[in-house]
């Protein structure tokens, strides 16, 4: 599945270069673009509330609810940014979101988040893992918008949640995100082979249509694409065709 990404700060779509709030490009208001992405055939949109991710008190709740309503029933919404408790998850699911993305909190408070996997349908929860890749044996998890690197390895965090029914994982190679420098195909091939029952989504760096067929061949269930669509490197329609023709 091709999953367009919309990252939102202060009501506008932005792209951050390698996660830096200081290096952002503004692409205007999100509703018309969301409608255009759906018109082109997007069946799922990946929304990130970057204000909420930075400060839960600044979550853009009204705008997020509006975007979810605009998308339903033609497209599903996968939403992340500032999820801090079970109530946040519940409210978003009740408002019509299909999947809720859990990032840093899944790393810092695993005991609490594992209970969410028992309380909610695990199909509605997505573990987002951002990693620094030093080698195939050394892939360290980063948290808090990539500002802090942990000693935790990628496989450790996946195994932790695999025991409670983990179904969906977004894995981002930090060095690629927002760069249009190409995807880390070997990373996705490796993790899809290691955990065949998990639906992995690749994230970061896609810069040409030929990469889509390579990523699909790696075993990923979805490809999150942000900047390439915003800058018209290729269209959603073209990307979907590449995915379907693989």
Swiss-Prot record:
Its main location: cytoplasm. Pfam families: His_biosynth. It comes from the Bacteria. Coiled coil: none annotated. The active site is at 7 (proton acceptor), 130 (proton donor). Keywords: Amino-acid biosynthesis, Cytoplasm, Histidine biosynthesis, Isomerase. The keyword Isomerase applies. It is found in: Cytoplasm. GO terms for biological process: L-histidine biosynthetic process; L-tryptophan biosynthetic process. It catalyses: 1-(5-phospho-beta-D-ribosyl)-5-[(5-phospho-beta-D-ribosylamino)methylideneamino]imidazole-4-carboxamide = 5-[(5-phospho-1-deoxy-D-ribulos-1-ylimino)methylamino]-1-(5-phospho-beta-D-ribosyl)imidazole-4-carboxamide. One of its GO terms (molecular function) is 1-(5-phosphoribosyl)-5-[(5-phosphoribosylamino)methylideneamino]imidazole-4-carboxamide isomerase activity. GO terms for cellular component: cytoplasm. SUPFAM superfamilies: Ribulose-phoshate binding barrel (SSF51366). HAMAP family: HisA. Belongs to the HisA/HisF family. NCBIfam families: 1-(5-phosphoribosyl)-5-[(5-phosphoribosylamino)methylideneamino]imidazole-4-carboxamide isomerase (TIGR00007). PANTHER family: 1-(5-PHOSPHORIBOSYL)-5-[(5-PHOSPHORIBOSYLAMINO)METHYLIDENEAMINO] IMIDAZOLE-4-CARBOXAMIDE ISOMERASE. This is 1-(5-phosphoribosyl)-5-[(5-phosphoribosylamino)methylideneamino] imidazole-4-carboxamide isomerase. The lineage of its organism: Bacteria, Pseudomonadati, Pseudomonadota, Gammaproteobacteria, Enterobacterales. The gene is hisA.
């Amino acid at each position: 599945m091709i999953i367009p990404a919309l990252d939102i700060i202060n009501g506008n779509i932005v792209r951050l270069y390698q996660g830096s709030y200081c290096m952002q490009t503004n692409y205007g208001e999100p509703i018309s673009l969301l409608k255009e992405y759906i018109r082109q055939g997007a069946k799922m949109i990946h929304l990130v509330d970057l204000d909420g991710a930075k400060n839960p008190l600044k979550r853009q709740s009204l705008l997020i609810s509006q975007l979810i309503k605009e998308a339903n029933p033609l497209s599903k919404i996968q939403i992340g940014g500032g999820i801090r408790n079970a109530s946040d998850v519940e409210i978003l699911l009740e408002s019509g979101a299909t999947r809720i993305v859990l990032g840093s909190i899944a790393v810092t408070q695993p005991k609490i988040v594992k209970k969410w996997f028992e309380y909610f349908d695990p199909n509605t929860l997505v573990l987002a893992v951002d990693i620094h890749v030093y080698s195939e044996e050394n892939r360290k998890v980063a948290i808090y918008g990539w500002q802090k690197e942990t000693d935790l390895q990628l496989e450790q965090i996946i195994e932790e949640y695999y025991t409670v029914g983990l179904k969906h994982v977004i894995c981002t190679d930090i060095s690629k995100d927002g760069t249009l420098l190409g995807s880390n195909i070997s990373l996705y091939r490796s993790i899809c082979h290691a955990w065949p029952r998990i639906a992995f989504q690749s994230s970061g760096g896609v810069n040409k249509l030929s990469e889509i067929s390579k990523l699909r061949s790696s075993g990923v269930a979805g490809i999150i694409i942000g900047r390439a669509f915003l800058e018209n490197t290729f269209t959603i329609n073209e990307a979907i065709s590449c995915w379907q023709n693989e």
